Amino acid sequence: MTDQLLVTTTENIPNQKYEIIGEVFGVTTQSKNALRDLGAGLKSIVGGEIKAYTSMLTESRDQAINRLCENAANLGADAVVMMRFDSGSIAGDMQSVVAYGTAVKFID
């Protein structure tokens, strides 16, 4: 979806005028599994990156951005400015990621 909609972390798009439509967001929550927890437990003893969790968070960020873009497109937006991420744990075994920003419509 991001190939059809401009998503930027900046407030302004150079040489582009636009009107603000409003806030948009995309959220996903994924649960950890027993095998990931076992691997994480071992890594916490010896140290190092927990690749299964890194992969899960990367996938979650991608899903959140795609959902953000779907919501913006449904509002007729051409772009999303000031995009940010937030994440957190839920009940110790779930990870939630939200992408949020401001949907805008280009003015000719």
Curated annotation (Swiss-Prot):
SUPFAM superfamilies the UniProt entry points to: YbjQ-like
Protein origin, superkingdom: Bacteria
HAMAP family registered for this protein in UniProt: UPF0145
Family according to the record: Belongs to the UPF0145 family.
Identification of the protein by name: UPF0145 protein LGAS_1099
Species of provenance: Lactobacillus gasseri (strain ATCC 33323 / DSM 20243 / BCRC 14619 / CIP 102991 / JCM 1131 / KCTC 3163 / NCIMB 11718 / NCTC 13722 / AM63)
Source species taxonomy: Bacteria, Bacillati, Bacillota, Bacilli, Lactobacillales
